[in-house]
Structures are given as C-alpha cells and as structure tokens.
Amino acid sequence: MNEPSACSGPPVKSKSSKNEPFYTLKALLPPYSEIQGNHDLLMSYELGPVEGGFSGSRRVKEKISSFLPHIIGEFHLDATKEASSLRALIEKPPIHKEISNLTSSSMQGFKLSAGPVDERYRHLFERRKEEPNLAYSEKLNLIRVRQQYDAYGFDDDETEKGFPKKHKKKKKDKKRKKEKEELGDAEKRKRAADEPMEF
C-alpha cells in the first residue's frame, strides 16, 4: 500500500505578490469558461418562470402591513389617492394668504394676569408642605426632590462609612504636617549646601 506523504496536495506557488505587475493583476489571464458575464443563469437553469412570478406585472395581493405585523395602524397609503406627493405640495400650497402679525388686542389672550391658582393645579404647590423631602425654589418656580443627607458621604463604600469624618480629617492633617516638615528639612539642607564653607 502506498501511504500518502505529508507533502501531498496542490503545488505551492513560490511566486510572491511582489513579482506581480500591479495590485490584483496577475501575469496570467484567467482560464476560459463557458459561463461569461453576459450569460443568463436563470434561463440556463430554467428558472425564468419562477423569477417572472415574483417580479412580473402581476399585482401582489398582500399589503406591506402583512409583512410587518409589529407596526400598528394602516401605513400602506397610495400617494395618488391621498394627494400627498411633493408636486401637489408645491403646486397647491396649504397656506393661501400672507402671514401677518397678531394685533395688540389679539395678544391680550396670551397675557398672564396675577390671581389665585386654579384648583386643578393647587395640589402641586401644597405638596411641599406635606412631604419634607421636597424643596421649593421661588426663583425658578419649581419643586425638586431634596436628597437625603448622609453624614458619611454618598459615594463612600461601607468600610469607609464605619469611621467618622473627624477621624479622616485628623489623618489628613497629620499627613499634611508631615509633608510640610519634610519640605522644610529639604530646604534647610539645600541652603546649607549652597552656603560657602569657612575655614
């Protein structure tokens, strides 16, 4: 029995891509094939009638909404029936008159007048008295939720919350004092080195 050798297979090309004349252009032309670019594969495999059934002039019975069941409402609209085309918007604009400014008498309807708050909106302003967690701002005329005060900080983890803030402050003060002393000693040594030695 002839066992297949480890190097069996198609011969490996020793030509590198550097020897090719241009990028993606090989020295040899591709081999001749009966199937060319202008060859109709649908007709050769007798699939012409199947393709004509999908893309022919026959009207499709199903609407777009049948393929998109998750969209609510009727969105299969005909532009010719609804007259919602761009040409109809240009030829027949919806505004036929000139836009004019409102008169002073017409603007009186938009003017705010001082008076008691309507009963429908009175509960918005009475909420701040009932709930202590709400803070009212007169400047901005709004009600915002006041955050609960935490003596140990909002972002501290549980291990840090076990120690009071005073303990942390003492540690920081000691550290700063030690750093100042070290800086003072370093300055003294520098001055002593810069001074000329007397004999």
UniProtKB/Swiss-Prot annotation:
A biological process from GO: positive regulation of transcription by RNA polymerase II
GO cellular component, one term: mediator complex
InterPro entries named among the record's database cross-references: Mediator_Med19_met
Feature: compositional bias, Basic and acidic residues: 179-199
Keyword line: Activator, Developmental protein, Nucleus, Transcription, Transcription regulation
Gene Ontology MF annotations: transcription coregulator activity
Cysteines engaged in disulfide bonds, as pairs: none
Subcellular location: Nucleus
Record carries keyword rRNA-binding: no
Pfam families: Med19 (PF10278)
Signal peptide residue numbers: none
UniProt biased composition (Basic residues): 164-178
Oligomeric form and interacting partners: Component of the Mediator complex.
Similarity section: Belongs to the Mediator complex subunit 19 family.
Function: Component of the Mediator complex, a coactivator involved in the regulated transcription of nearly all RNA polymerase II-dependent genes. Mediator functions as a bridge to convey information from gene-specific regulatory proteins to the basal RNA polymerase II transcription machinery. Mediator is recruited to promoters by direct interactions with regulatory proteins and serves as a scaffold for the assembly of a functional preinitiation complex with RNA polymerase II and the general transcription factors.
Protein name according to UniProt: Mediator of RNA polymerase II transcription subunit 19
Lineage: Eukaryota, Metazoa, Ecdysozoa, Nematoda, Chromadorea
Gene designation per UniProt: mdt-19
